[in-house]
């Protein structure tokens, strides 16, 4: 599953380790979700987070996020929303084929869908992700029981 993460999600994850944003970040770092971004977006996020985040442990976690991030190249600039910085998120979608854009920005969320990618809040994403994960494991458990494996 490929996702694009808005910077506000990374910032919010630092504020609350029980938040959906933090849970998503951990799933990405653990390799269960693939996060995608353009090189430019990644560089800008790194700079912003260095200024805003003071907690050393969280800074290390964010650096791990950047290490596992799938960096893509922008092939075509887009103009989907009024904020040029937010348009870079949509460029990441177009370049990566991501299935979800996770954001808490109201203007970004108003788009709802772009190139087959759902634009969702962390809570909505988490609920869909866990529902898909639970369905798969239940089916797997059931099939193992029937097959005796």
Q: Which role does the model predict for each range below?
A:
Residues 106-149:
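Acidic, PIN/NYN-like endoribonuclease modules and their adjacent C-terminal/linker elements
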Residues 1-18:
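Metal-dependent nucleic-acid phosphoesterase active-site entry motif
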Residues 70-102, 106, 110:
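Active-site neighborhoods of divalent-metal-dependent phosphate/nucleic-acid chemistry enzymes
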Residues 5-7, 38, 104-105, 121:
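A secondary-structure boundary/capping signal
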Residues 5, 20-50:
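PIN/NYN-family metal-dependent endoribonuclease catalytic core
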Residues 1-3, 98-100, 116:
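The start of beta-strands in P-loop NTPase/AAA+ ATPase cores
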């Amino acid at each position: 599953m490929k996702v694009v993460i808005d910077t506000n999600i990374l910032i919010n994850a630092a504020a609350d380790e029980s938040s959906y944003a933090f849970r998503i970040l951990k799933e990405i770092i653990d390799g269960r979700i693939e996060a995608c971004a353009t090189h430019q977006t990644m560089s800008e996020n790194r700079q912003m987070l260095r200024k805003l985040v003071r907690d050393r442990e969280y800074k290390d976690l964010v650096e791990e996020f950047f290490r596992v991030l799938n960096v893509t190249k922008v092939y075509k600039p887009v103009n989907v929303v009024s904020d040029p910085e937010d348009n870079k998120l949509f460029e990441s979608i177009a370049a990566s084929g991501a299935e979800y854009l996770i954001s808490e920005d109201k203007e970004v969320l108003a788009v709802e869908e772009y190139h087959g990618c759902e634009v969702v809040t962390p809570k909505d994403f988490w609920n869909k992700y866990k529902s898909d994960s639970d369905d798969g494991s239940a089916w797997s458990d059931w099939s193992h029981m029937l097959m005796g494996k």
